[in-house]
């Protein structure tokens, strides 16, 4: 019997809510949001942000209210102004465009995404063809692809591996987007190794710790839940993967922006709901869902800590220097 099952036996006549931990903000998201908040407090408006700082509309709307201006391209930023790169990273082309416009850049790229960029440059310099496992239209993949576009191909499924054409099958390396499904990525890597026996990979896996931890937590409780709800925006890759993981194990699952997205029919005949959140979803949205479900009779709330998570990332030098120069400016998240 799992931990969740044993807990459920304590409240046989009460509908249960299993609140998964870890959930919500990862270290890279906390860092990125802190960077925007500190920049706004230290420098005032306007502060431009290229793309959504993280993939959550509530976070973006909150920062917009504080004065952040989100743009799709650095070409939209007036010359000489400050611009923050999102947590998903940018290509060298974007960096060069910023330089040409004399923009004052603050880089909020997640350090784990930067790691993938560094690996791409390294493999390309060593003469390898690169296979980037990920979703072609995701901001992170677009940025990584830009490091070595001439030698990089993107694949999103095992089936796509068969159609790859490479100049030298013995000089191949793969990298992955950081927010993918562990299981699907494992299948793609297996297909690559079968097709290209000499293929090389990163020294350590590219899928980030938070993506992995949240997927492991979902797997841990999926069999004990009648329904899984994932708080996260539709453009959040890691949030969508959590839904897919649950469904692959036979547990109905839905992605919700907030409690207003919950449909009453989902809760019919449901005794146990599991609740988690993607890595860019604020905790207050989770608590609003908890309150909503309590009103629907899910009053037995049990928080299950599947594993500890205490990762923190340092701030970029330009932000550290700002805090040092103005002690009143502090990290808020």
Functional labels for PLM-detected ranges:
Residues 2-277, 283-333:
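The feature marks the mature, well-folded catalytic cores of soluble enzymes
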């Amino acid at each position: 019997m799992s931990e969740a099952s044993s807990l459920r036996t304590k409240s046989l006549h009460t509908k249960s809510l299993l609140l998964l931990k870890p959930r919500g903000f990862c270290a890279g998201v906390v860092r990125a949001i802190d960077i925007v908040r500190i920049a706004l407090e230290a420098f005032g408006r306007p502060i431009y942000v290229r793309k959504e700082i993280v993939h959550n509309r509530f976070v973006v709307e909150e920062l917009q209210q504080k004065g952040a201006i989100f743009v799709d391209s650095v070409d939209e930023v007036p010359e000489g102004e400050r611009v923050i790169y999102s947590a998903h990273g940018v290509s060298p082309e974007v960096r060069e465009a910023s330089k040409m416009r004399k923009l004052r850049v603050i880089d909020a790229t997640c350090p784990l995404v930067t790691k993938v960029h560094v690996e791409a440059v390294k493999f390309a310099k060593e003469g390898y063809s690169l296979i980037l496992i990920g979703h072609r239209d995701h901001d992170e993949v677009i940025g990584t692809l830009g490091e070595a576009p001439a030698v990089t191909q993107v694949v999103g499924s095992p089936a796509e591996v068969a159609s790859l054409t490479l100049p030298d099958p013995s000089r191949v390396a793969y990298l992955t987007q950081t927010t993918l499904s562990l299981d699907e990525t494992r299948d793609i890597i297996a297909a690559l190794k079968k097709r290209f026996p000499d293929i090389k990979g990163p020294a350590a896996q590219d899928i980030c710790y938070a993506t992995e931890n949240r997927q492991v937590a979902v797997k841990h409780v999926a069999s004990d839940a009648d329904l899984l709800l994932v708080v996260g925006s539709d453009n959040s890759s890691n949030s969508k993967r959590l839904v897919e993981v649950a469904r692959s194990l036979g547990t109905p699952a839905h992605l919700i922006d907030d409690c207003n997205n919950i449909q009453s029919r989902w809760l019919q005949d449901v005794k146990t709901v599991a609740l988690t959140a993607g890595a860019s979803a604020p905790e207050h949205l989770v608590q609003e869902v908890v309150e909503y479900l309590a009103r629907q009779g899910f009053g037995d709330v049990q928080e299950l800590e599947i594993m500890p998570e205490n990762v923190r990332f340092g701030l970029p030098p330009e932000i550290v220097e700002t805090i040092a120069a103005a002690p009143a400016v502090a990290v808020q998240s």
